[in-house]
Amino acid sequence: MRIVSTLASLLFVFLGLHLPWLANAANAASGRYLEVTYPPSQNTNELVLGVTYRLWIPEGAKTIRGVIVHQHGCGVGSRKGAETGAQDLHWQALAKKWDCALLAPSYHQEEKDNCRLWCDPRNGSHKTFLRGLADFAKQSGHPELERAPWCLWGHSGGGFWASIMQTMYPERIVGIWFRSGTAFETWERGDIPKPEISTAAYSVPMMMNPGVKENGDKRFNGAWTGSLAMFKAYRAKGAPVGFAPDPRTNHETGDSRYLAIPFFDACLKLRLPEAGGKTQVLKPVDQKTAWLAELLSDSAQSAASFKGDRKTSVWLPDANFAIAWKQYVKTGATEDNTPPPAPTDLKATTKADGINLTWQAETDFESGLTAFIIQRDGEMLAQFPEKPQNKFGRPLFQNMTYGDTPVAPLLDFQFTDKTAKLGAKHEYRIVTVNSVGKQSPPSQGAAIGR
């Protein structure tokens, strides 16, 4: 089922814009899609750019416990790439685990537009963001969406936006992942008004994630220095903030999702109120249960055993995350020794062009989804897709953009065996392959011609 607001539909028909995320919505995990679009406002202190918000709600979620916000960076390419953000299978897996919605904004910035018209939320984007949540709450029949807490992921200008939102709405934020972007140095230089930073803002869990190759880069050095400066300043105040430099990348997001998703998983576990409770107030972070590391090191210890200076240490939410963090800062990715879940609901149907196979699949929570092996009568028939793509990281079933969103058009969970002879008897099975090459057990079989 998919719900799209009337305003959004009319606006995009008028503008003649293509919506690849809607055209391919069937491939994503079971759930509902909603969309709202707001035109530019001419009112003082309101957003002067248009924006589209796209939301995914997992099937079976009775109460929405939070909203995972995947915020793109500056520029036309970033905002176009964000059109598929709500369809990302791996981020959907995180949302589904915690009964959260997945939200992907796309600000209608053109090349001539100053990014700060939206990435400084004080220029109106914070009001439109709240308006979007309120409208989604009405559309979806989930009134709790309007007040649900947020996980904020931001790349570049999206991190800039998130750092200011943190000063405005700290009580709403479960945690923040800053991928190569923050407004900290910008306000410290006086280029934008410096926000008031409350005690509550220093209680929000954060992870700074710049690319090591940004350090000294002519264009993106500020992403490195800004991330490091914000880390040092906030950690000195006792904030639960970590530093996870990506050794393989410059400003692109690379394979950062394999650490960002575990980070939010740990923060949601630490901070969400009990499911089914009456409150949406977040739990405080108990830093005694954390793991700590020296800055720019690749080893970590429990807080109880750490002997260094805590005010300069890297904060890590728990032991499991610390293991992944150590792997990531060494290699730019994380390990996974477990197989993905087997596909389900395999169906085989005779069509004019061959045997059509459809199935469902859960995304491997640790390492995502790369491909499916199609088996016929116990032997490998094909791999789908034949050559998974991703020039920024591990090849995936959903090819990735520079900004960690799926490349359109998106693939469905279906395959046609065009080599089967008409009327022949065959049994098919499907195997899931994750991004480290681990294979699931085969699915239940689906017979044809019997």
Predicted feature locations:
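A domain-start/cap signature at the N-terminus of enzymes
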Residues: W21-V67, W98, W150-M165, Y169, ...
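Cap/lid segment of the alpha/beta-hydrolase catalytic domain
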Residues: K96, L102-K127
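Alpha/beta-hydrolase active-site loop
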Residues: L117-E144
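The feature captures the conserved acid-bearing segment of alpha/beta-hydrolase catalytic domains
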Residues: V174-R257
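Alpha/beta-hydrolase-fold serine-hydrolase catalytic core, especially in secreted/extracellular enzymes
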Residues: K237-A239, P247-T344
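Pro/Thr/Ser/Gly-rich low-complexity, intrinsically disordered linker/stalk tracts
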Residues: V329-G368, L422, G437-R450
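Recognizes extended acidic, P/S/T-rich segments that occur
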Residues: A371-G423
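Beta-strand-rich modules
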Residues: D417-K438
